[in-house]
């Protein structure tokens, strides 16, 4: 806010840490940006809301600092008195002020990260393509070997609509405007007049942000979510995916002096519009709409690029030679303009544009720039790219390679990566829905049989027999239930999409809560019904099991072994290039067994799956269903990929990106490029370089098994075995209020109960983040370490310290926990505990949580041999510490509003205040879901 409120240096409120001068200089520039934005926001608040609101914000902030730093009881009483004295409208104004400061501080921090990326650009470092290629060279891997690796590689970020981004798109658009202005300030040398004009622009942007609704008034539809997801293609993917390929291609060609094109390996995926698991609003019609929106975005981008390319390629025939193929392409163009008669490249581009426009019309897209004349539509993206290749070869052959390496190169690569469909849309549904659908189909087709009553082996035998049968299972003369008709309609829509866009438009059919071989065969049979699996044993779609619970992870290798032993299924895998994808669920396994056990069972499942797939001679591709928060598998992607067991990556990886994580990673082109580079570099390193390192020692695995067992017992003991825990959870968190936020199209619970088992993982994790406990990201660790050291009194702690130093998996596990605990606050959490009306229950459960929190922090510090949390990550430590003075007040206000909301009749203004605090706290935490 103004110089009176916001510019205080929160870093100075803690004991200073000795750091290198470069880091201090980084901090100074970051603080300059925060001060500037804070001053502008403060002036805006004073102008718009008055001096009184302005002063109260400062009092709350200062008192909150005392409470957080010292757990000061007088500060707590003073804070409660200030908040009690506020009217609801003033409370809302104050919440908005603190929330927007968190948003603006995030922008400044992002800009600082971009500054660091630019400073390090081109230098070999972990997570960079340059660093990874240098590492590969150092261990004797040639450029040609790397080209062969990428020819069979797949790196696929998959965007999902999991509802963890609480900001409206309008808010994000305004914030991107502020970010763009900060970037301009960074890049340009301005005169005094330009500096003043620039600040005026910032003031306009911040004022507009202040006067923009922070909350959505209506619930998002699925197609709204699709449109939001597509905006990141404009910001990042459509340009940065081709650029990353170009960077790698150039580096490899520089290494060995060749001039070879690199195979495209980075492919985008999406769940938005195809994920039906628990979302009744994703129908066949919605899926059709999602595919249309995706394709429209891709074709419009290509048409715009062709229009620009036509302007650029003003090459005259009498000044430069052209190839025969190019001349033929120009002659076929419907462009009859005399102005371009001697410009063969422009004529060729006009013809290509006309054919692509005809393709768009064939796919029933409107609102495109009119072509110069009628033309034949392209049959597929390969035909379109073949014409672009003619331009490329002609330029190369006639000494114009520098032109070929510009916009044309980027466009050719984009077509190769995005096709006409933009991203492969995954279909996902719960295995229970497939089971009910198959039951209805089989019971109608085979009177007297009861599919639901059959055991697993009987089901496998029946489904395998049906797979070999040439007759369809569904009948047009049977009146099926609504659910079955809906599922059949979705599969038929998938078949139609394949006919319209090609086989890459929908490549995966994912089975949530997969518990057996029959769950897989049911989906194969549904694909066969619509022609996506044929009688010759060819499948147009990968059937992907999703193993989510601890029990299912433990059973996963056995299920896949049985499945790959079935001749009828193995034929389908062979038809897909001998690759079988398996998805692992981080969220539900965490909710089921806790952070430590979830991480360990996922690791063990991967080890066992690698063995099974090697035995069957099938290539394993793992799809990691990670969330944004550590409690849902989040954390740095580079570390997570390198921490995988040997053989688990093997050149292919898919990974979910969702909600606030999509925004933070891909709303800025440079940041997007960096994150794509990290995924590519980590996949290469984990596949080619890490296998050369030795596997973890047996005693490491034994120790982790013991830790997991102890942690599982502690976690389950609290969450599932403590009487009254569900009541405590629902009373001490904002779980009820989260459902009112309109942040996604999907319901928060699978069933209308208060059972933890029925709650989705996102609201579970989100709720614990809001009350600043982050319990899913650490609970059980302290008890596990205490029990382990007690069993190994002589060398237990020293051995765990060795594990941390030597084993990437354990190091990554603890590093993520370090970050989570640094964001937590037991003092603030104690205020949420007071919302529980039963004092005995409150003291019993919060007492256990508090003891485990202290024990987990101490265990973590002992193993990492640190004096404080995040000691080994000073940049993140500073970042989190900077946020507390503006984040903590939102928690205090939220508690007071929750008290009022739950003790009186529903007041929309109070509820709106709670929703605003949820928004602001999420912004301050950055990865809360």
From Swiss-Prot:
Where is the catalytic site? 162, 591
One of the record's GO molecular function terms: phosphoenolpyruvate carboxylase activity
The EC number(s) this enzyme carries: 4.1.1.31
Q: Which cofactor does it need?
A: Mg(2+)
Keywords, A to Z?
Carbon dioxide fixation, Lyase, Magnesium
If you read the UniProt record, what top EC class would you report for this enzyme, in one word?
lyase
Q: Which domain of life is it from?
A: Bacteria
* Gene Ontology BP annotations: carbon fixation; oxaloacetate metabolic process; tricarboxylic acid cycle
Reaction it catalyzes: oxaloacetate + phosphate = phosphoenolpyruvate + hydrogencarbonate
Can you list the GO cellular component terms from the UniProt entry?
cytosol
InterPro entries named in the record: PEP_COase (IPR021135), PEP_COase_bac/pln-type (IPR022805), PEP_COase_Lys_AS (IPR018129), PEPCASE_His_AS (IPR033129), Pyrv/PenolPyrv_kinase-like_dom (IPR015813)
NCBIfam families cross-referenced by the UniProt entry: PRK00009.1 (NF000584)
What protein family is recorded?
A: Belongs to the PEPCase type 1 family.
Q: What does this protein do?
A: Forms oxaloacetate, a four-carbon dicarboxylic acid source for the tricarboxylic acid cycle.
Protein name (Swiss-Prot/TrEMBL): Phosphoenolpyruvate carboxylase
Q: Which organism is it from?
A: Rhodopseudomonas palustris (strain BisB18)
